Amino acid sequence: MPLSPTRSLRAAFACGALAAACGPVLAAEPAPPWTFTSNVNLVSDYRFRGIDQTWGRPAVQGGADAVHSSGFYAGVWGSNVSGNVYPGGNLEFDYYGGYNGKINDDFSFTVGGYGYAYPGANVDKAACGSAAYPAPCSLPSQSFDTFEVNGGVTWKWISYKLSISATDYFGANTKTGYSKGTHGTLYHDITVTVPLPEDWSVTGHVGRTDVKASYGTINPDYTDWRLTVAKTFAGGWNASLAAVGATNSTFYAPPTGGLSAANGDTRKLNQTTAVVQVGRTF
């Protein structure tokens, strides 16, 4: 028989008087040390550091994360990509881990590593005769897989993060036409997120890529930016609208840069565009 309000109150008083007897029944279970979450997203165009990864087409993305109460974390993430950008491949698989620490309520920090893998993709599968690989050409065997170490700090709404490539940066080295290897390439990320009422937020981001080599006479360094308006909903749902772009059309846009597909289609990889995203976290 369910307890009436009066009986519930009496039971509470009884436990107060007999704590030794009732304590084990009322004791809260300790929080588990690990928290596991997953996410899935649909985006109208996948941009990485301002550069088009899907040839202007949509992407389905998803990931899973494990976070320990001590601050350590690890996760995986994946997305479809275009074979025009990563010849021979159509998938990006990322893996990462690290530690998030907190100094006080306003100041926190992070250190970690992040890997990018593109199964099946290789420079030797590119279309010879493109802007990146003008004919006649003999394309080398070179993957795009990359690993970075990173560290960052956050103060209230503002964060800064530095990523340093521990490998050649997405296959850029002397074999692929660069003046030297590109390990040590830097990516600076400054992000400001302003929370708004009703679970809205506005985020502004500026990034700077400093590639440790030139491509012929062209400097591939560039700045990217993103302005995002986002909204979270009940049940883990979220949506956003972003304006995204990047500089250095000399390197990332035809006729001196960019990429060409096997059918001759060209793409300005850094053009400013709107990106719509809908996702859910579980």
Question: Where would I find each of the regions flagged by the language model?
Answer:
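Transmembrane beta-strands of outer-membrane beta-barrel pores
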Residues: 42-48, 78-82, 101, 115-119, ...
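Cleavable N-terminal export/targeting peptides
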Residues: 1-35
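Transmembrane beta-strand segments of Gram-negative outer membrane beta-barrel proteins
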Residues: 30-44, 72
